[in-house]
A protein has these predicted regions:
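Flexible, glycine/threonine-enriched loop-and-boundary segments that flank and lead into catalytic domains
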Residues: 357-377, 478-480, 497, 505
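Charged, surface-exposed helical/loop "interaction arms" that form contiguous linear patches used
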Residues: 273, 277, 287-290, 339-340, ...
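ATPase nucleotide-binding head domains, primarily ABC-like/P-loop NTPase cores
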Residues: 143, 212, 223, 390-422, ...
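Extended, charged coiled-coil "arm/hinge" scaffolds of SMC/Rad50-like chromosome-maintenance ATPases
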Residues: 407, 411-445
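Amphipathic alpha-helical
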Residues: 1-17, 460-468, 475, 641
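C-terminal tails and terminal domains of large nucleic-acid-associated
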Residues: 735-763
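Charged catalytic and DNA/RNA-contacting regions of genome-maintenance
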Residues: 1-243, 252, 256-259, 263-272, ...
Length: 763
């Protein structure tokens, strides 16, 4: 952004200079920012010092939101980089131009000279910025990969938004081990913050987010994106939610009080960055005014939120005394400071008003004093204020009048006293602007001193907003408090899908249980199309996620052992830009799951193998289930929905596999899907019935029914097991009765008629 500087020259154009560089990650204007989400600038660097075969295995990510002051850094395996960036969804990513970011990382990417990520320089920048002697106090080692990522951000801000550096008062080093891991595929498949169509409504966030403040909405997004892995922290959040569930009147009163609050977090940071305008302080004052009421509403409830935050009495008093109730939008206009705050300013304003009144009354006073009826007072830009008398009466002008201009029909005069008042009037507005600007800056300077205190208050308000919002969601949705523990069990009674049940306005949602018994590893779920298998899988994952973010869950009851990762393989999607088919995408995601899942993970696998031929798909699905069950370092709790009914045979072979299916009612040639998960395997998918429901023409349905009957008569369904094959199961019949009979037949002894009869018999 270039602005005019200096005075307008006699010739030529105004001199200009670059006053600011704007990039996607350094925007601060409220109109350009998403109110309910952070605007992150991320820095990414790969660790080439520990590369294997020239391939880095470690990376560091640092991110900052200069509108809130959030500044953090972590080191992570390269394979987790995409998932972390997906969670952050940064507006801009900077990285060294000497490195190539892994595939799949998209967005606004800015490559910077590699020297800006140099270890010594970056550490020095951080130490200098935080006025520290070492980075150990921030949990970092000098010259470490994390220091390079964070230091590069500080250097970038120096070039683009130097005022924003005041906002960076701390740096938080975090570990991925603090939060549940959710890769990009899982976030998409579970529709955490947006649906597959890119809409917020219909997502988990859209269902749970009853928050009413901008700070609360950003924090809610973080909680949904980062479920916790510490039972104590989860319990603390649950305590807060429970309080608001049980105290509906308090919840309603608090939410009504919070609703009109401004974005205190971003207002403070605009003050810190020197970008605050008068109406920003009015909004801050209105918000601070509500703090005593908020604190009174939750008085004594330490289980809800810490009571260490301040009601900012001094800051509120300052804003009430200093800033006018209805100031102009910018400091370019007067009326910012409240009358009575500054005697100096009041004196100038009074003098200006007195001068204007004196000049306004001057014409009548002078006419009466001189008796000249044609006397009048005027103004122009050349001479300023003047007294004009007609030529015929000019000789009656008092001696105190000083002739200034002679016209054809009049003479113009000034007086010393008039010029004094003129100076007061003409200079007063600029003088008022000057004083108001100085006073405004002084008020902002006092707020800067209290910035940390106000920001702590903003964070407390955000947490209150989220807890009360989750309480609202729980009360409206009939959610219950889950028991989250350090064990490995998973027990959900009458679980429901939190989003789908809200969309089923007229129909009652059918709840289902998920109870993994001791030793149970994989649930193979078969059943008709459109019967609810995929919904059942997703609701299980969402209930676990909600429990670990601290929310209540849509279930009659739930006991959930900590889950470190949720993996999903759901749906068919081509990665055309990467040259990958539907089946290749499916296999890549399945491989990722098998390589990175742990015994504490939850695997949601829907229709694995359907992207290829039946035999290939069945073989792969079979092998995957065996691998999950048998691998000693895997054995993750798995829900495996499939149309391959042959997979139900695995329950007879492997002790940790159970069969379940979706109940169907058949009567009078009608099929009704009951949406209830029951024990046992299904032997039909009712695909033709679904086609009929979808409106396929009757001849198509009739012909499909005939073909299905023929196929069922001729297909071999038996699965034979070799008990000595170390679980390498033969999926299909090893011999065919027809082939055996053909081998035993002596074709040389058959007559032509006998041969034709045999063919007719085998038809």
């Amino acid at each position: 952004i270039c602005e005019q500087v200096g005075e307008q020259p006699v010739k030529g154009i105004f001199p200009r200079k670059v006053v600011r560089v704007v990039t996607p990650g350094t925007v601060t204007e409220p109109g350009l920012l998403p109110g309910d989400a952070n605007n992150y600038l991320a820095s990414v660097i790969l660790d080439t010092t520990t590369a294997v075969n020239s391939n880095p295995i470690t990376a560091s990510v640092s991110y900052v939101d200069i509108t809130t002051g959030e500044f953090a850094v972590t080191e992570l395996p390269l394979e987790a980089l995409r998932a972390e960036l997906t969670r952050l969804h940064p507006a801009e990513i900077i990285h060294p131009d000497s490195q190539v970011l892994p595939d799949g990382i998209t967005g606004h990417i800015t490559a910077l000279p590699a020297w800006k990520f140099e270890p010594g320089k970056c550490s020095e920048v951080l130490i200098s910025h935080f006025k520290a002697s070492t980075l150990a106090g921030f949990g970092l080692k000098d010259n470490s990969l994390s220091a390079r990522a964070a230091g590069a951000i500080v250097q970038y801000l120096k070039e683009t938004q130097p005022d924003a550096l005041n906002l960076l008062t701390s740096l938080r080093a975090y570990s991925l081990n603090e939060f549940m891991t959710l890769d990009a595929s899982t976030r998409r498949n579970l529709e955490l913050d947006e649906t597959l169509r890119g809409e917020r409504k219909g997502s988990l966030l859209g269902t749970l987010d009853f928050s009413v403040t901008p700070m609360g909405k950003r924090l809610m997004h973080q909680w949904v994106s980062q479920p916790l892995l510490h039972v104590a922290k989860i319990t603390q959040r649950q305590n807060g939610v429970q309080y608001f569930v049980e105290n509906g009147m308090v919840r309603a009163e608090l939410r009504a009080t919070l609703k009109p609050l401004a974005d205190l977090e971003r207002l403070v940071n605009r003050v810190l960055a020197g970008q605050a305008q008068p109406r920003d302080l009015v909004a801050m004052r209105a918000t601070l005014t509500e703090l005593p009421k908020i604190k009174e509403v939750i008085s004594g409830q330490k289980a809800v939120v810490s009571d260490q935050w301040s009601v900012c009495t001094q800051e509120l008093s300052l804003l009430q005394n200093a800033i006018d109730d209805d100031p102009p939008a910018t400091l370019q206009n007067t009326g910012v400071i409240r009358p009575g705050y500054s005697s100096e300013l009041d004196g100038v304003i009074d003098a200006s008003k007195h001068a204007r009144d004196w000049i306004a009354n001057l014409e009548g006073v002078e006419r009466e004093k001189t008796g000249i009826k044609t006397l009048k007072v005027g103004y122009n830009k050349v001479f300023g204020y003047y007294i004009e008398i007609s030529r015929g009466a000019a000789d009656k002008a008092p001696e105190s009048y000083i002739r200034k201009q002679t016209l054809v029909n009049a003479e113009r005069f000034i007086t010393p006293e008039m010029k004094e008042y003129e100076t007061l009037v003409l200079n007063a507005e600029e003088r008022i602007k000057e004083i108001e600007t100085r006073l405004f800056r002084e008020v902002c300077a006092e707020l800067v001193k209290a910035a940390n205190q106000i920001l702590a208050t903003a964070r407390a308000i955000a947490e209150l907003d989220v807890l009360s919002a989750l309480g609202e969601a729980a009360a409206l949705g009939g959610y219950t408090r889950p028991e989250v523990h350090e064990g490995s069990g998973l027990e959900i009674h009458e679980g429901r899908h939190p989003v789908v049940e809200q969309l089923l306005k007229s129909d009652r949602y059918i709840p289902n249980d998920v109870i993994f018994e001791k030793g149970e590893v994989v649930r193979v779920i078969t059943g008709p199309n459109m019967s609810g298998k995929s919904t059942y899988l997703r609701q299980t994952a969402l209930i676990v996620l909600m429990a670990q973010m601290g929310s209540f869950v849509p279930a009659a009851s739930a006991k959930i052992g900590l889950v470190d990762r949720i993996f999903t393989r759901i749906g068919a999607q081509d990665e055309i830009h990467a040259g990958q088919s539907t089946f290749m995408v499916e296999m890549v995601e399945a491989a990722n799951i098998l390589h990175h899942a742990t015994p504490r993970s939850l695997l949601i696998l829907d229709e694995i193998g359907r992207g290829t031929s039946t035999y290939d798909g069945l073989s792969i699905a079979w092998g995957i289930i065996e691998y999950i069950h048998n691998h000693p370092q895997l054995r993750a709790k798995t829900l495996f929905a499939t149309h391959y009914h042959e997979l139900t045979q695995l329950a007879d072979l492997l002790p940790g596999i159970r069969n379940y299916n979706v109940a169907v009612s058949e009567a009078d040639n009608k099929v009704v899907f009951l949406h209830k998960i029951i024990a046992g395997g299904a032997d039909r998918s009712y695909g033709i019935h679904v086609g009929q429901l979808a409106g396929l023409p009757a001849p198509v349905i009739q012909r499909a029914t005939e073909i299905m009957a023929e196929l069922e008569k001729t297909s071999g369904r038996a699965v034979k097991i070799d008990p000595n094959a170390a679980q390498q199961v033969a999926l299909f019949p090893e011999t065919n009765p027809l082939l055996d009979e053909l081998k035993e037949l002596d074709v040389n002894s058959l007559s032509p008629i006998e041969a034709l009869n045999k063919l007719f018999e085998w038809r």
